[in-house]
From Swiss-Prot:
Residues the record marks as active site: 737, 780
Similarity section: Belongs to the peptidase S16 family.
Record has Cytoplasm as a keyword: yes
EC number per UniProt: 3.4.21.53
Annotated protein name in UniProt: Lon protease
Residues annotated for ATP binding in this entry: 367-374
Gene name, Swiss-Prot/TrEMBL: lon
Region: Disordered, residue numbers: 574-605
Reported induction: By heat shock.
Length: 831
């Protein structure tokens, strides 16, 4: 056959796959050029060349592969719609030598040359063929690609290239993969490539078989379950056990009717609608569980259930006094609120038609951590005998946590407010919104905006929960919020609350709280008797001053608990027989009397005495809450007063002057406001020096080169650079209240005048020298008192407005002086 080649043959393009020499395959033609080519070949008894069409084309590239099969047309038949069916017999592989061209008769012709295989080592090839056949048999066991007759044909054939073609044709390879096998004339390489392909195909077929098996098993299991469920339904129907669902539905309808008088029409219709849907829903439907959960949740909301016990102001006072020491002002404000509520209740009994106008009270306790804000709310709930619900808002950033999730979501549930009503089983509980200043905004909404509706007495009568899908009356709920910093609460939300300050405790107040509340409570928690642990007065004072740094008493409780734990351990070490004792053995000991106890070695008079001398054995770490003041009066050091989230503090401010050009340098992690305060203070001091309100000798400049003629005389603030530093540089500081302290230390260093060490001050300074009021006065003065300060300078407006809030102990031991302007400050500060 190769003698007459290369020769020009008609070209046909097969769309789907490669044809092989041994194949007799039907081909369908619809293209006119291809039909003309077949007619020409049949009339002239010519061979034809069939190439496979490419899926992806590059620019200037033929739309078919350059290899294909040479063969003859065995039979031709016309089909409907102008199509032609022919039976093609493949004879040999061929390659297109030059691009095909369209001839005068209107079909493609190409110059074709047969593909000749390279010589090969028969023994080596035979070994590879055997491996290939083994892999094919393995593949045949897990797939239907190789039927038995094809396996037999492979076994009977000795031509390795024919075997490779048979396998490649059966694998239905992708066109590019088939092309490389088809065009390769290296027999050994073709066989090795086929082995890799067969191995990969075997893995794929095994995986598909496993997946199909699992799917089939699951379908069988599903069908089986469905069949069994249908049988079970029929059995239940015969036995009458399916009546349980009907009974549940009847109970839902009955409960809905019982609370109908307390429901708005909207709420009644929504719940009834969902019960009706539940009755029509198949029990095995996924909607059934969702609907049932909704109905049961909504029917659990205590509509119409109110705590009806009348308010008693006397009882409220007693409860607050029993639970909390000091806090006189907050207690008074709380009692005033509930006195108003009690009066409203009394008047509404006479005029029932006005009862619905009673609005829930909204209080917000704010102050440092550990001062008793949340426990005050607990005491209020006890005092008015209503259930307490606590909702932690710290870090809350999803509005749906408050408003509820819509029922379109899987696992949806009502918001925390509605859940709180269900938990309380009353519609008028005390609801504590803890840490309301720590609510965050995110892409999931702004919870603070939802709180506007919840806390507004004019709106919360119709609070709409997304899960419930109807409005709920919250007007009878007593909302109590707690916060550390009310400045972080949005202004519209602040406008809806009444704020009650719960500020820092004085050392003596902490001591009384520890004696009357903390120590008895911790003794009980640790199973110790009051006679077994004795904490002396001096020791308790030392714990408060040296081992805690806080405005409240939370850390003080922890320190006392540490002592109790070590006391409990000491008790067990001294009385080892007490380990694992039973009630029976204890009763026996009692009957045996003291003699038996002494035999067992129990100390009858066990007592751990905690004194300042042995305190380090129980508490190892000292905090030193506030450093004591220096007794020596120094130039360039002043005592400022600062407010922190954990209470007040004495803030020392230092200044030095360096020969320079009058520049001001600030260090100590100061914020923008505090830096501006320093600049204002520097300008005010300059004005005082210019006016000679502050007197200081003028500083001569350096002489000229000949040391004869002096230049002009400089003012002190132009002759020196001023460096102002606020210690603890790693701690950020900000705020305007250090203005007068900064001015004092600048005046001290520039005038070389010492500052009284027993004086501390706080106040904002204006450019005209006036002293403006500041916040956190109580905490600042308590800090001054703890540090041993004798005189505290405060703005006159704070003196007039806030002095009555200062604890009596502080007012009696601290000389509090009101100042109007910087001149008065410097007069009382500089020596």
């Amino acid at each position: 056959m190769t003698e007459d080649f290369p020769k020009i043959l008609p070209l046909l393009v097969e769309e789907d796959t490669f044809l092989y020499p041994f194949m007799i395959a039907p081909i369908f033609l619809q293209n006119n050029a291809s039909i003309k080519a077949v007619a020409y070949a049949k009339n002239n008894k010519s061979l034809v060349f069939i190439a496979c069409q490419k899926d992806k084309l590059n620019d200037n590239e033929a739309p078919y592969y350059d290899v294909g099969v040479i063969g003859s047309v065995m039979r031709e038949a016309n089909m409907p719609n102008g199509r032609v069916k022919l039976l093609f017999n493949g004879i040999a592989k061929g390659r297109i030598l030059e691009p095909a061209k369209e001839n005068e008769q209107g079909f493609l012709e190409a110059q074709i040359s047969p593909i000749e295989y390279l010589e090969y080592d028969k023994e080596n090839i035979q070994a590879i063929v055997e491996v290939l056949k083994e892999k094919v048999i393995t593949l045949a066991n897990v797939s239907s690609l190789f039927p038995p007759d094809l396996i037999k044909a492979l076994e009977d054939n000795d031509d390795p290239n024919r075997i490779a073609d048979l396998i490649a044709a059966a694998l239905h390879l992708k066109k590019d993969q088939a092309y490389f096998l088809f065009a390769n004339n290296n027999t050994e390489q073709r066989l090795l490539d086929l082995i890799d392909i067969v191995i990969e195909e075997t893995k794929t077929q095994k995986l598909q078989k496993e997946i199909k098996s699992k799917v089939h098993q699951k379908m069988e299991q599903t069908n089986k379950e469905y069949f069994l469920k249908e049988q079970l339904k029929q059995i239940q129907k015969e036995l009458g056990t399916d009546k349980q669902r009907d009974e549940d539905l009847n109970q839902y309808y009955q409960k809905l009717e019982s609370i109908k008088p307390f429901l708005k029409e909207e709420a009644f219709k929504e719940i009834k609608k969902q019960i009706d849907r539940l009755s029509r829903t198949h029990a095995d439907s996924s909607d059934s569980a969702t609907l049932q959960n909704y109905v049961e949740t909504m029917l659990d909301v205590p509509f119409g259930q109110y705590e009806k016990k009348a308010l008693d102001i006397k009882h409220v006072k007693e409860q607050l006094d029993n639970d909390h020491y000091s806090l006189k002002r907050p207690k008074e404000r709380i009692v005033e609120y509930f006195a108003t509520m009690q009066l409203l209740e009394m008047r509404h009994k006479k005029k029932p038609e006005k009862k619905d106008k009673t609005k829930g009270t909204i209080l917000c306790f704010y102050g440092p951590p550990g001062v008793g804000k949340t426990s005050l709310a607990n005491s209020i709930a006890k005092a008015i005998e209503r259930p307490l619900v606590r909702i932690a808002l710290g870090g809350l950033e999803d509005v749906n946590e408050l408003r509820g999730h819509r029922r379109t979501y899987i696992g949806s549930m009502p918001g925390r407010i509605v859940q709180g009503l269900i938990e309380a089983k009353k519609m008028n509980p005390v609801m504590v919104l803890d840490e309301i200043d720590k609510v965050d905004r995110s892409v999931r909404g702004d919870p603070a905006s939802a709180l506007l509706e919840i806390l507004d007495p004019e709106q919360n009568i119709a609070f709409r929960d997304h899960y419930a899908n109807f409005s709920i009356d919250l007007s009878q709920v007593i909302f109590i919020a707690t916060a550390n910093n009310i400045d972080r609460i949005p202004a519209p939300l602040r406008d809806r609350m009444e704020f009650i300050s719960v500020s820092s405790y004085t050392p003596s107040e902490k001591e009384e709280i520890a004696k009357n509340y903390l120590i008895p409570q911790e003794l009980e928690k640790h199973a110790l008797k009051p006679s077994e642990v004795d904490i002396s007065h001096e020791c308790l004072k030392l714990i408060i001053e040296k081992y805690t740094r806080e405005a409240g008493v939370r850390d003080l409780r922890r320190q006392i608990a540490t002592i109790m734990r070590k006391a409990a351990l000491k008790y067990l070490e001294d009385n080892p027989h007490k380990k694992g004792r039973t009630k029976k053995s204890e009763d026996k000991d009692k009957k045996g009397g003291n003699e038996e106890n002494e035999k067992r070695g129990e100390s009858k008079d066990f007592c751990v005495s905690i004194t300042p001398d042995n305190l380090k054995e129980y508490l190892e770490r000292m905090v030193f809450e506030i450093d004591p003041i220096d007794e020596e009066n120094k130039i360039g050091i002043v005592n400022g007063l600062a407010w922190t989230p954990v209470g007040g503090d004495v803030l020392k401010i230092e200044a030095v002057k360096i020969r320079g050009k009058g520049e001001l340098k600030l260090t100590g992690s100061l914020g923008d406001v505090m830096k501006e305060s320093a600049i204002i203070a520097f300008s005010v001091v300059k004005v005082l020096l210019d006016n000679e309100t502050l007197k200081v000798p003028k500083i001569p400049s350096e002489t000229d080169a000949e040391n004869k003629k002096k230049k002009k005389v400089l003012k002190v603030y132009n002759a020196y650079d001023l460096h102002l530093h606020v210690p603890e540089g790693a701690t950020p500081k900000d705020g305007p209240s250090a203005g007068i302290a900064m001015a004092s230390v600048m005046a001290s260093i520039l005038c070389d005048r010492a500052i009284r060490s027993e004086v501390a001050m706080t106040g904002e300074l204006t450019l005209s020298g006036e002293v403006l009021p500041i916040g956190g006065l109580k905490e600042k003065l308590i800090a001054a008192f703890k540090a041993g300060i004798k005189t505290a300078l405060i703005p006159v407006k704070n003196y007039e407005r806030d002095l009555d809030e200062i604890p009596t102990e502080v007012r009696e031991n601290l000389n509090i002086v009101a100042v109007k302007n910087i001149a008065e400050v410097l007069e009382k500060t500089l020596l």
